Amino acid sequence: MDFIFHYQSSWLIPMLPFLSAFVAGFGLISFRLPTRSLRHLYGLISTITVFFSMIISMNLLWKYIIGHSNYCFLFPWIVNDNISLKLGFFIDPLSSLMLFLVTSVAVLVMSYSHGYMSHDQSYVRFFAYLSLFTASMLGLVLSPNLFQIYIFWELVGMCSYLLIGFWFTRPNAASACQKAFITNRIGDFCLLLGILGLYWFTNSFDFITVTKRTEEIISNNNSHLYFFIFCSFLLFCGPIAKSAQFPLHIWLPDAMEGPTPISALIHAATMVAAGIFLVARLFPLFQLFPSIMNLITCIGILTAFLGSTIALSQIDLKKSLAYSTISQLGYMMVAMGIGSYKAGLFHLVTHAYSKALLFLGSGSVIHNLEPLLGYNPENNQNLVFMGGLGKSMPITRFTFLIGTLSLCGVPPFACFWSKDEIIADAWKYNFNLGLIAWITAGLTGFYMFRVYLLAFEGDFRGIIFLNKNNLKSTKEVHESNLYMLIPLIILSFLSLFIGFISTPFHDYLYIFLDSPIVYDNETSYFQILLNFSSIGVALIGMIIAYSIYAYNNISIDFGFFKRSLKKIYFEFYQFSFSKWYIEVFYHSLFLSGTRNLAQLLFYLDQWLFDGVVNLTGISTLLGGQSLKYKESGRVSSYLFSILIGALVLFFFLPLHNSQIGSN
């Protein structure tokens, strides 16, 4: 038992869910019918293995809380005169915190999935993918170098592709998983180039060694500065894609085509968290280059504002939460870019539990609307057809409200402490940056409370859908089963209390992380006023949402802005609903542009290249056809041709010789 809770047993944390995935996958391939008959057993095994991983992670976290030092274990994999590749695991405060975060969310998601996916024919395949996804993220967190982190980085991307396209018979799901995979290919390729570029100069993949040697090389030879800046930019492109930052954010909303438990895991603790984790892991390297830190800040604040403005007008429940995730990830990037390392990780933790709660709550709503509105996501996820669900789903409503208040930044819920700290640090760093972050907080309050009101308050509007399609249903919406409710209740407590690990009164997280940034703890009255103003602007956004959607939302057809507000507001609504026309631009540039280029190349190939080849053959054919008539067999014709040739030579040669003589 002592070995299990020792540092050297850390490899068990990713290995247990990996073995669970292997057993389920092997069973599906080799013993399909027996495996399907034991489907619930496989689901239970998957949950138990991740639960044991969580217990080991909790033990490691506790060891660091009481003051243990870092631990690294490496063994050589490929060693020769030219290259040395090592694998292993690295335990420090950052990895121990992330291990507990990933495993705790994964256990709750798997427990929830027993109820949500119970009737799905591919139940075992779902848990196999889910276990592999969790194992890949845990392996990424434990990676001691860039080489190993890239291996698990790719595995995380592959698992997201499999899970987003889990219902691959749906055209939208098949398209969404391809979109996610291709978009992330851009970031992954840049990340690979950045890793290879740094290895070329530093001859190492180790995080600490790469940072130290980079600093030494730059201090000794400043001519290599721009090369290292470029490599750092390439490294950052990986998190841009993985964490859905502008301009590679377009895949995340479409990823909602996957099962809702997967959406919760992707948005809370795996896929998008991987990008933030990599920035945190490479934070000392990025700090060497102020231009890279400024780029991280600019990308982050633009993404935060973009995500919040698009979320204002979305009518799909899960996509509204997806754009919320994009916005909150932007906040985390802002924190990293301005040097607020601890605040960024703090918001990663608080947002993970709050967003997992919101997605699992939305899954509870969708799961109970499917028998009534059908299994088409355009109907059962449409906020237009919801409303009044709080009457029949009180526990789901209450837990969803807790997640909403947390994400809005209402004290004392978890996200209040983390988001407020990021906004405060943004004000300190730059006034304009703080202003945009502050406005984004107000928008967050509006769109999150709007989602809650449209889903749970007022009267049930699903009758509109039923009447429109001449359908009658005797089924009623009811509360979810205990498999789904217990994770919601646990996440509600976490969303309420997890924020107290880092407060202005005592910052336990700062002490635990041993943050590389020294903070100015002096707080002015102006700073306190700014902190309270962020709460105020969030409340203003919530009040505006309440005034619009709380009372007469049964008659809302989302033409409100067009009918009752000025044209400029309607145009802003259209701008938001059209997602800033970014996807329209991408479609015109890449999809239509590629098709037009292919069409142009087709015509060039057909008429120019093939034309030259075909012209050679045709000209030879015509020449042969014309010459065959001259081969008549008559001697007089041949003599006439010889005479003509002789006359030409007789007159041409003297003329040519005279020109040569004059020269």
Swiss-Prot record:
One of its GO terms (cellular component) is chloroplast thylakoid membrane. GO terms for biological process: ATP synthesis coupled electron transport; electron transport coupled proton transport. The keyword Kinase does not apply. It catalyses: a plastoquinone + NADH + (n+1) H(+)(in) = a plastoquinol + NAD(+) + n H(+)(out); a plastoquinone + NADPH + (n+1) H(+)(in) = a plastoquinol + NADP(+) + n H(+)(out). InterPro entries: NADH_UbQ_OxRdtase_chlpt_su5_C, NADHpl_OxRdtase_5_subgr, ND/Mrp_TM, NU5C-like, Proton_antipo_N. NDH is composed of at least 16 different subunits, 5 of which are encoded in the nucleus. NDH shuttles electrons from NAD(P)H:plastoquinone, via FMN and iron-sulfur (Fe-S) centers, to quinones in the photosynthetic chain and possibly in a chloroplast respiratory chain. The immediate electron acceptor for the enzyme in this species is believed to be plastoquinone. Couples the redox reaction to proton translocation, and thus conserves the redox energy in a proton gradient. Belongs to the complex I subunit 5 family. This is NAD(P)H-quinone oxidoreductase subunit 5, chloroplastic. It comes from Chara vulgaris (Common stonewort).
